[in-house]
Amino acid sequence: MNLLLETIIYGNNMDYLHKCRVLMEYIDTGYYDEIMKAKIYPKIVYYYLKKQILFKEYWNVETQTENLKICEKAIDKLRDAGRTYYLVELLEIEIQILETMPEDAVTEHLEKNETDKINARELISVIKNLYAEYEVPAYMQDCTYFYQQKWIFSMKDVLRTRRAMFGLTQEQLCEGICSVKSLRRAEKGQTDMQRETLKKLLNRLGLSGQMQWSRLITSDREVIRMAEELADYINDRKFSVASKQLESLKSRIDLDIPQNKQYFLEKQALLEFEQGKVTREEFVKMEKEALECTLCAENLYRKENVYLTEREIICISNSWKGMEGKQKRESINLILRLYDYYALNNGLSQAISVYEIVTEAAVNELGNNGEHVRAEEIDRKSIKASLSCRRVWDIHYKIYDILWNEKKLMKKSGKRVSNNRMNTELKRCIIMSHYVKRYFYENVYKEKLS
């Protein structure tokens, strides 16, 4: 779809605008999830409206209103996905359209569409300042966001590292599957194993034989959709609704698959803990049970070199809510060390989705433990990585984290954060949480405004 759009943009197309409209309609009617729509739809709209503006002297109120609706629809798709692809460009176009419309037409449009509106000028100011603060370009320009890979490791490293984590010799791992020579060559990257042989080795190491999967191993698209809804319910802290959704999912997934069972147990543990149905100690045990669906490793937290799946990382980071003392510190350090190592070799953009979740959890625990400077450093590193990937769904949370840790540090030195700074940062939190439709947090920040 992106290549088709690029052909339209840079080719000699007499019906450029019509083809852009066809692509918009196709994206809306085709089977695309929110993330995929956010990646391509705003780009189509941006180039469509950019071309339209060349003819703005011929616009009438109907054309202006239609273009405004198209622009707002593209921005709303970004909001649903928590992304900022072409956001600044679209906001500038929206402002430009509003400035050319008659005042009464603008008023009428706003009155008809007042529900959940965003203030374009206010939002663009916050977005631009945020990107400037973290030294990330605000405009898309020649960004290659379509072509990023996620959480990619060399198979030779996965086999070697995971085998060491399980404490297995090469002979023990390949027993009944393949020759030691084949495994040795695979661990050195000297050969590509047959798919079925590799799948059996990975299964023995607690890994899926599939090269790629999302939250669950299934071919049922409805299950994937339900899992996405479940994640939204948890993000919105609708835990009782999420629990019902999880029960509905349970009957539709194969729990004999270790990764699916791990997903279910991890979600069940989290929801029961958040609803106060289990103690901290019970919660840690439940997360440990979920983790051990795929990983049973002695002295895991003290290992220097590890390979963990994203779901295993989430099981471990969830456990921090119930841990204390040395065990918690070792666990946090293990995960942060894993990401630091990965970033050196691949960059954080390839691991950003779970990195955001993990750093948020780590910062909460470090801040509560009085490690405010380290917590702020991690938050700032995470914000920069998220902005670079055009992801802003939890930026509001991290801005508030930084403010909270700053308050604690100032209090230790006998000082206090000024009301002006408090209100400025809280307003940023309000605007960003509203943008990503996290209304629970938006209301929390509003209550804290002095």
Predicted regions and their residues:
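A short, Lys/Arg-rich alpha-helix, primarily the initiator
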Residues: 138-165
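Amphipathic alpha-helical segments of tetratricopeptide repeats
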Residues: 21-32, 68-80, 124-129, 243-254, ...
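DNA major-groove recognition helix of helix-turn-helix/homeodomain DNA-binding modules
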Residues: 194-213
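Short alpha-helical DNA-recognition segment
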Residues: 164-185
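Short coil/turn connectors between adjacent alpha-helices in alpha-solenoid helical repeat scaffolds
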Residues: 4-19, 50-67, 100-119, 230-240, ...
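Alpha-solenoid helical repeat architecture
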Residues: 1-2, 30-43, 81-89, 138-139, ...
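Helix-turn-helix/homeodomain-like alpha-helical modules used for DNA recognition
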Residues: 219-276
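"A position-specific structural signal for the A-helix of alpha-solenoid helical repeats
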Residues: 2-6, 42-50, 89-100, 158, ...
